[in-house]
Curated annotation (Swiss-Prot):
PROSITE patterns from the UniProt entry: HSF_DOMAIN
Source organism (scientific name): Gallus gallus (Chicken)
GO biological process terms held by the UniProt record: negative regulation of protein ubiquitination; protein stabilization; response to light stimulus; response to sodium arsenite
Name of the featured protein: Heat shock factor protein 2
Record's function text: DNA-binding protein that specifically binds heat shock promoter elements (HSE) and activates transcription. HSF2 shows constitutive DNA binding activity, even without heat shock.
Gene (UniProt): HSF2
Biased composition (Polar residues): 448-465
Amino acid sequence: MKQEPQQQQPAQQPPPAGAGVPAFLSKLWALVGEAPSNQLITWSQNGQSFLVLDEQRFAKEILPKYFKHNNMASFVRQLNMYGFRKVVHVDSGIVKLERDGLVEFQHPYFKQGREDLLEHIKRKVSSSRPEENKISQEDLSKIISSAQKVEIKQETIESRLSALKRENESLWREVAELRAKHLKQQQVIRKIVQFIVTLVQNNQLVSLKRKRPLLLNTNGPTKSNVFQQIVKEPADNNNHVPLNRTEGLKQREQISDDIIIYDVTEDVADEENTMVDEENAPITPETNEDTTSDSSNCSRSPDIVIVEDDNEEEYAPVIQGDKSTESVAVSANDPLSPVSDSTSPLMSSAVQLNNQSTLTAEDPVSMMDSILNENGVISQNINLLGKVELLDYLDSIDCSLEDFQAMLSGRQFSIDPDLLFDLFTSSVQMNPTDHIPNTKMETKGIETTKSNAGPAASQETQVSKPKSDKQLIQYTAFPLLAFLDGNPGSTVESGSSATETPSSVDKPLEVDELLESSLDPEPTQSKLVRLEPLTEAEASEATLFYLCELAPAPMDTDMPFLDN
């Protein structure tokens, strides 16, 4: 009964196309409102939705009339595209099953009698829009352009990296070459040092073959007698004049190899008496087998050994002589011999007044000869040189060093790496107070005599002025040669006061007393400084080192030589 009034209503015509309503909505509005189709599709009782009574018949009979298909699924999909939703009836939480296949669809703007609301029903738009696609294309073009720029920069960076790699490789090769050159230079320097040390060690070994007594032993083997040059210096004259004299008070076999000069006490009267007795005493020459063979050299090569004895009671000078020399008595009235006159400039230049002097145990001339010449031989005809000759001699030494360098550049030598460490770390470091003498002890020296006194000098003048001919004389050694000889040490004596040399002995001793003192089983402790014999020519060459004013090297202590 309710459907009859709906069938009597006139059929609603679809809105014109110009109204902006989609064709699907217009067809749907006409389909629901037409009377012939009300049996299959119709409005609901409240007019807010429409119902499909029989889906199969509706798909076969109604859909082909309004649409180009008879597929119910396509119709439902189109309804969903415009926002229609399927209505589900729920009674007490249970879905009401449609026996007859009733399906209800609902839209807020699709209502019965409200055709004007159809304009508000819009089809859903897809998520992808062409504008958005255009924007993404622009972004893509930007990304592509930026990627191209990055690629160009990357190529530039790669080229720079390759250049840096090549430069780095060249630098490493250069560093390796420089390291190799540096290593070779170090090896050359080590070989040079090794060669120099070898020369010094060879020279030292040669010098060790000479017979030398122990420094702390006063008894030793016999030794050839030599002339002793005693320098006497008058009070009014500063020139040192050497005098050849033989004053042997002991036999060579019974005394030490070295000359012993005992310190003189401060008793002035005993000194005066001793000076008178000494000049009037006979001189006994010594005989030895070595004297006959070496008399010519020994007469010109003094062997001076200074012994400082702790015994303060007895003092006696022992001076060696050659058997070929006549026994003479030297007095204040006797003139000087021609030999002493010829060697007076030598001794005046060789003996210097130096408050900071030290002593060496090796012959400086022979040491320098062994360095400059491999065979250790130098001409014996070198006389006393002047300033010009001295400069020429030093130039010759420089030339020898240049030849030395040229010889080193053309030869190969082996070197021990440990030797350099021992060479530069074996220097002796001693306490400067170890060798400072006691202020109460007497210093040792060389007796000085009058020079150019002449026959007019009388003995009374000597007695009246016993201390007028005493001079402070010290011996200056050679530190460079002492270091090369392998005996470095500290200074023997240092201080503000100069060393004093006694001119005479305290008491004259007889030959028997000297023999008894030499046979003493417990000899007193003494300090020895050994000087090897020098010829006249060698002594003249030694003057060069005094003119150079080389600082001396100490020899109080025995130092080990460099190891091979």
